[in-house]
């Protein structure tokens, strides 16, 4: 098979440039470890979409299909050129873009988590204010995107510069969502009070957003308090309110309370439980070991799928993987392929992830090879799953071979890719090679949204101490300083590193590195 050939011929450079395997060679003895097979169920929390596409435009619906523009932007070979390059090229070809088209493109980009490109489209429109009249709804969407891409300070500055007549409940809700995403509790609670005073907290959205914050902070009693306030003020719970409430009850480990909420949901004539309702319940049942109830909930998920909606299938694939039910996993996969014309990278990712978690590496490799000729783009998250499994099984050379294959195929290694390899070299006690991988992780595209796992750093520092390698330890500390990670005191405390401390540990704890790889697998 293609993957096997790539791994078996690692001495032959697969990429036009020097292959990774020739740059990093470690011949130290492998730390003997029994790989852990612990399976963990990913917690799924239904979070309301803060804003849908609601821009009202005076323009007539254009004949030109917006999805042609979307595809050009989303499949750019050089995304660093920005969405503006695509839009300028489109207009130079004599095709005038309309606001309706551009807002529809933004909607699709947001749907697939391409916030940076969506914001670039809005920036392009803002630079042509004489052509594109933007509304308060547009401002709310832009604020949400700015918060995701540029951070809270820029989002606050954008909010302050808006005309007062633009600062409606949608814009306030967008800023609230930005605070919640950043887990900025004090600012979120203060803004909610302002929204209460202005009469902007008379609908479910701000309460749903705050419930999400308290869920993320594991303050489940606060979720109940939000529900109580809504009922006190006769604010009807919507489907998102119920789904978050269900997730909160499940996170407390209470089957009875979760099922009681579901009964309330069923008795609410304005609510029809959707597939998210049952995927949330299935997730919680899996977490609590209620296999039969989980499988019943998953059947209800499947029954609620309408049209060619792909997302529910991704949840089904992931959750059947958490159950370890390979038969149902493949059945859903074949159904999925029969109802949609093409499966996106996320679909293949869900299947590969489940197979890896079930220990079926050979099956995961087959799916990887099936994905290669049909992929929309080379997504490093998919091979990362396999590389992580190889490293966990002490097959670093196999992981390096897949890395070389990724580069040959035009894939761009992510920070997580390099982190996985760094773990592999740490397990083999190769400090120099692990340090090289960490340097590459900090310089990889998108590294500003990444920081190394606590267990990764603890293991590396422990190895440095055992080998009396102060220089390598200091090199990683400098990388952390430059990235700003050392400014986070809670993160620093978890790493438990004192630059002047020397610890005499007998050996690297193999179980710790296995736990790290399990954590990496869940994040991938």
Swiss-Prot record:
PROSITE patterns: PPR. Keywords: Repeat. The lineage of its organism: Eukaryota, Viridiplantae, Streptophyta, Embryophyta, Tracheophyta. Belongs to the PPR family. P subfamily. GO terms for cellular component: chloroplast. This is Pentatricopeptide repeat-containing protein At1g02150. It comes from Arabidopsis thaliana. PPR repeats lie at residues 168-202, 203-237, 238-268, 274-304, 309-339, 344-378, 379-413. GO terms for molecular function: mRNA binding.
């Amino acid at each position: 098979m293609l993957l096997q050939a790539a791994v078996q011929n690692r001495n032959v450079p697969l990429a036009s440039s020097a292959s990774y395997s020739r740059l990093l060679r470690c011949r130290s003895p492998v730390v003997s470890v029994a790989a852990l097979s612990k399976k963990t169920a990913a917690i799924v929390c239904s979070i309301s979409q803060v804003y849908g596409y609601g821009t009202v435009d005076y323009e007539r619906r254009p004949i030109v299909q917006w999805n042609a523009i979307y595809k050009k932007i989303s499949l750019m070979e050089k995304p660093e050129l920005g969405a503006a390059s695509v839009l300028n090229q489109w207009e130079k070809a004599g095709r005038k873009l309309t606001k309706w088209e551009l807002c529809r493109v933004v909607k699709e980009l947001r749907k697939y988590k391409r916030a940076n490109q969506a914001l670039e489209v809005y920036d392009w429109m803002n630079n042509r204010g004489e052509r594109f009249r933007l509304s308060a709804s547009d401002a709310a969407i832009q604020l949400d995107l700015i918060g995701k891409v540029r951070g809270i300070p820029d989002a606050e500055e954008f909010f302050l510069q808006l005309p007062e007549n633009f600062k409606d409940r949608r814009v306030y809700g967008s800023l609230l969502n930005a605070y919640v995403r950043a887990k900025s509790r004090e600012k979120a609670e203060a803004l909610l009070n302002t929204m209460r005073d202005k009469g902007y907290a008379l609908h479910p959205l701000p309460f749903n957003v705050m419930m999400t914050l308290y869920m993320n902070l594991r303050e489940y009693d606060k979720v109940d308090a939000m529900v109580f306030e809504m009922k006190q003020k006769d604010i009807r719970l919507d489907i998102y309110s119920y789904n978050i409430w269900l997730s909160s009850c499940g996170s407390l480990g209470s089957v009875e309370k979760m099922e009681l909420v579901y009964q309330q949901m069923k008795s609410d004539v304005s609510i029809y439980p959707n597939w998210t309702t049952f995927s949330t319940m299935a997730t919680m049942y899996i977490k609590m070991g209620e296999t039969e109830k989980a499988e019943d909930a998953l059947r209800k998920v499947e029954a609620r799928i309408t049209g060619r909606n792909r997302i529910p299938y991704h949840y089904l694939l992931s959750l059947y993987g958490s159950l370890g039910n390979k038969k149902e996993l493949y059945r859903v996969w074949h159904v999925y392929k029969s109802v949609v014309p093409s499966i996106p990278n996320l679909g293949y990712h869900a299947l590969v992830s489940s197979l890896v978690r079930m220990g079926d590496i050979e099956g995961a490799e087959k799916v990887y090879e099936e994905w290669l000729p049909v992929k929309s783009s080379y997504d490093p998250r998919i091979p990362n799953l396999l590389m992580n499994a190889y490293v966990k099984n002490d097959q670093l050379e196999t992981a390096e071979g897949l890395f070389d294959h990724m580069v040959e195929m035009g894939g761009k290694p992510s920070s997580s890719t390099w982190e996985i390899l760094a773990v592999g070299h740490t397990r083999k006690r190769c400090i120099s090679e692990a340090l090289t991988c960490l340097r590459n992780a900090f310089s990889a595209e998108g590294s500003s949204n990444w920081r190394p796992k606590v267990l990764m750093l603890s293991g590396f520092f422990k190895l440095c101490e055992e080998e009396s390698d102060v220089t390598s330890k200091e090199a990683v500390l400098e990388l952390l300083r430059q990235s700003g990670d050392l400014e986070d005191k809670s993160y620093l405390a978890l790493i438990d590193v004192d630059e002047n401390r020397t610890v005499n540990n007998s050996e690297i704890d193999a179980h710790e590195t296995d736990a790290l790889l399990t954590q990496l697998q869940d994040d991938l």
